[in-house]
Amino acid sequence: LSEWRGQSAQIRIVDEVEASWGHIIADDFQLTDIRPNFLAWDQHERTFTVSKEHLVFPIHNLPETVERGFRDRKDWLEVKGSPVQLLFDGKTVRHYWARLAQNEQEVNWYASLSLEDFEGKEVTVRSWRSTEAGFDLIQQSNSIPGEEHFHKEAFRPKFHFTQKTGFNNDPNGMVYHDGIWHYFWQHNPMKKTMGNQTWGYATSTDLLHWIQHKGALFPYTNGDHYMFSGCGTVDKQNTAGFGENAIVLFFTNTSVGECIAYSNDGGKSFQRYENNPIITFDKHDTSGKPFHVGRDPKVIWYAYDAADTPLNETAAKFGGHWVMLVYDFTNGKENQSGRFYTSVDMKHWEHQSDLFGYFECMELFKLPVDGDETNPCWVIYSGDAKYAVGDFDGKTFTPEHEGKYRLHYGTYYASQTFDNAPSGRKIQVGWNTSQAAPEAPYAGHHSFPHELTLHQEAEGIRMRANPIEEIKELRVRSHHLENVEFTDSTPAILPLNSNTFDLTLEFEPGDTEQVILNIPGTHIRYKTKEQMIEHREIPLKLIDGKVKIRVLVDVCLYEIVGNDGRVYVSLPRDYKQKISEIKLEARGGTAKLTQLEVHELKSIWDYGPN
């Protein structure tokens, strides 16, 4: 403040957000001639011509207890870190918060931003509250420091996709286009906790082997315009005028509303729609756009059949219309709902209905019951994956039952399915919320892709989830054991020296109290009388006196599939526990193993014969 010494000044705190409840805490302002003992907001910047692929940033982790549980306001800057900006042509094109290492000894890992869009151009990197030594470690590079070890580390999954660095949460924008599976996710490239909402991006031709690309959507101003969750689809008929067969992403921009970005080059680049938002957060907007408060748009194409009445002549010409299902809390969280909008051009939307009792990260799709295309049913769910089945007429969803059903359990949240998948497949991926090892350069996991189907059960129509058939391509060695009785004192044992495998077990629990599948790093207990998996009391009924359990084990996590997909459970595993055998024990009686089949799986990052 030295340049204003002797002059009057005023500190003004302005809250311009009217959309939802909130408050600002601003206190303890002090004037002093003594520099405080924390890093001041001194600015460092460097202008350079882009000649390499990445701009890398030295990151220093805080202990997880501090990162996740700070309470003292003075710790806030320690947790949030420092603003970091990339500027091009005088404009901020990337804006993040990062906890930069203050010297080389403090570096835990390096974050990276792609410079591909600025090749040969002059850009400026700028940061505040960093030391000169720390800022000097921000450099151009053709690789990420430590990249030679990625996907080979002892703590990282081998057949579940993980981003190279940074944090992930919700899957986003999942779409199949011209032979390529496009997968996006909520990504914090600068930290191992949530924030800096960016859309990470990877593609695959087989749902197994993934190539990570530069991010697709970025925050670009200070503290707002974060790229929250959304979806992807293909505009086959060019209804929006973005181009035939364009990939179109819908996302929540936290400052303005629901927005669009599109690609005409197969996902190599995405352009934001110039008239964003298409649904506004500004209740004073006079453009005629719909207003709401919420997030996470899901957009699907609703194709007409003979019973449908088209929205208008344009919809009749195209043979259908677009439907947006979006989390809405315009009237408060106590009235949260899934809100349905319709459109013929993706740009202009009309509110049609609300389905109360649903919240963020919603999904809507149609599936045949027992594979019968003449007997389809609609499914709807939100972030917790609890779902309802019913009818949808293009405007309103009508559940055919009270309440919701549950398929997914454990560390599983915010799942999404691939739009436009071939043969009508519904391939689902969820955010596996289990954390990575403290020494890892990434945090968060993605579930293994699984296929959803509908089936007529005795209780009604229910959904199942099973790992995609493509997993068979990862098998390298197989082991079998069958027709073995086992007890507590005489367990059934299968020697196995692998931390990555696909196990299928069928057993008759008989008069036992419990059957225990003992895999080093985890125990799966089946309680016979209660007919449930003990962990979180997951129901799993006997079928003809038998239980079938499939387990995907992968270094630091595992997934349980019960009775051919009737339950799907995601859980963490202690990666330090090496597996040398699988053991089956029975408590309180004798059980019979009818079949145990184990397939060791190779890493999805092994492309060659070795």
Which residue ranges define each predicted feature?
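Beta-rich accessory regions
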Residues: 22-23, 33, 39-58, 63-90, ...
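Conserved Ser/Thr-centered positions that define the repeating blades of beta-propeller domains
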Residues: 87, 204, 263-264, 340-343, ...
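Short glycine/acidic-enriched loop and turn motifs that connect beta-strands
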Residues: 188-192, 254-256, 329-332, 435-436
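Surface loop/turn signatures of beta-propeller and other carbohydrate-active proteins
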Residues: 35-39, 92-106, 135-172, 191-194, ...
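Extracellular carbohydrate recognition and processing domains
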Residues: 1-9, 14-21, 36-41, 58-60, ...
